[in-house]
Amino acid sequence: MNATIPQRSAKQNPVELYDLQLQALASIARTLSREQQIDELLEQVLAVLHNDLGLLHGLVTISDPEHGALQIGAIHTDSEAVAQACEGVRYRSGEGVIGNVLKHGNSVVLGRISADPRFLDRLALYDLEMPFIAVPIKNPEGNTIGVLAAQPDCRADEHMPARTRFLEIVANLLAQTVRLVVNIEDGREAADERDELRREVRGKYGFENMVVGHTPTMRRVFDQIRRVAKWNSTVLVLGESGTGKELIASAIHYKSPRAHRPFVRLNCAALPETLLESELFGHEKGAFTGAVKQRKGRFEQADGGTLFLDEIGEISPMFQAKLLRVLQEGEFERVGGNQTVRVNVRIVAATNRDLESEVEKGKFREDLYYRLNVMAIRIPPLRERTADIPELAEFLLGKIGRQQGRPLTVTDSAIRLLMSHRWPGNVRELENCLERSAIMSEDGTITRDVVSLTGVDNESPPLAAPLPEVNLADETLDDRERVIAALEQAGWVQAKAARLLGMTPRQIAYRIQTLNIHMRKI
């Protein structure tokens, strides 16, 4: 718990501060996805604030329902005496700066601590001539369940609003973690909720946990996601129905600088054109029968974030022209209105159609096609990546098992049958098959016979071409991809894979466990 004050320049450029904050957010997101106790996670988040941004002596207080007050959940200090003294400190609603944040649910910013009589200085930790920021941590219902506070390492300056907004974003990230602590105090089961939190955080900030696959085609998809996520360019996701195009769009958003802004979805094929226009652009009061008040459309809802337009190939030529204008100029009018609305939205579109062919036939505007197709990502159908089916089956059964509250396993013979099927409905069909198999299984074990009852048969698809050998020294591979590639080259023999990676058998066994790699039987 080293709280040595970091050295940094007194005057900070806004762009530098913004870059530092983005890096810190990424670090905090990774921290919250780790398999650790909640108090350790909180302390590590406070360490990031202290070391990377000069937000010193961070403090997280958590609602204590038994006493109707806030108790200290974590504090960043190198003083063991201060840490021990904090154990009994509580703040009642309205008491001190922390209690005021709890009572009113608003952030409090002090330009100089000594100038504000509300500051109680119970911890004797903060410089009274320096600023202090405290922000609320709220649950989804909007109730304050904790407070995040820290002291900037410089006197009040023009960056105080930016620092405050940043702490509010961090407080939002911490909200679920703090909510778990409150639930534990209420006597709820902690382990399942902690696991759920980790899944949610990983789902948002690690696409490897959203999109499963280790074959070369999927590794190329992952590499494309990493590259394009850093840019604001429009992305066109191509693939058959059921391949997971929305998951790819979500992964792009949550790996991008827009991750803390909205991710809004719309299926263009689900609405008639008249409703589609209102849904995307919004409408003014009285624009049509039933429009009793003004309503923002999906573009406005996604302002600053990402708008995912699924089934983009289904929109009419007339509507294509309206969409093109928004992509070109970033502006539109609500239905029934004449006031121009400007938005900053990244578009990720998806289709199962061959848009290039549609352009040649005159069914899709060429200029819109090129606006959408700045970067195209093709998702391979499941029949082209059957080697991913064992890992996919494990992943999907884990998801189904959590939803149904029962453990599920699958036998090797069932996996072989699943790998022999052509899966015209792709991953969606596989998930449906596994859920039906789970329902029909007596003890949660999915056997070949159970899978056969769902209608899946051995179709013996043509053998895929041999997979090209992966360069284990490739720096674009992450740890999980590198270990899987080594295992594939070693025929899934751990000792042989360890030699390829320059590891001991114990080290690779630890990596396999911590990286959640499902070993294939040979």
Swiss-Prot record:
Required for activation of most nif operons, which are directly involved in nitrogen fixation. Residues 37-178 form the GAF domain. Residues 211-439 form the Sigma-54 factor interaction domain. Gene3D superfamilies: 1.10.8.60, 3.30.450.40, Homeodomain-like (1.10.10.60), P-loop containing nucleotide triphosphate hydrolases (3.40.50.300). PROSITE patterns: SIGMA54_INTERACT_1, SIGMA54_INTERACT_2, SIGMA54_INTERACT_3, SIGMA54_INTERACT_4. It comes from the Bacteria. GO terms for molecular function: ATP binding; ATP hydrolysis activity; DNA-binding transcription factor activity; sequence-specific DNA binding. Keywords: Activator, ATP-binding, DNA-binding, Nitrogen fixation, Nucleotide-binding, Transcription, Transcription regulation, Two-component regulatory system. Residues 494-513 bind DNA. The gene is nifA. This is Nif-specific regulatory protein. Residues 480-522 are annotated as: C-terminal DNA-binding domain. Residues 440-479 are annotated as: Inter-domain linker. GO terms for biological process: nitrogen fixation; phosphorelay signal transduction system. Disulfide bonds: none annotated. The keyword ATP-binding applies. InterPro entries: AAA+_ATPase, GAF, GAF-like_dom_sf, Homeodomain-like_sf, HTH_Fis, Nif-specific_regulatory_prot, P-loop_NTPase, Sigma_54_int. Pfam families: GAF_2 (PF13185), HTH_8 (PF02954), Sigma54_activat (PF00158). Interacts with sigma-54. Residues 1-184 are annotated as: A domain. ATP binds at residues 239-246, 302-311.
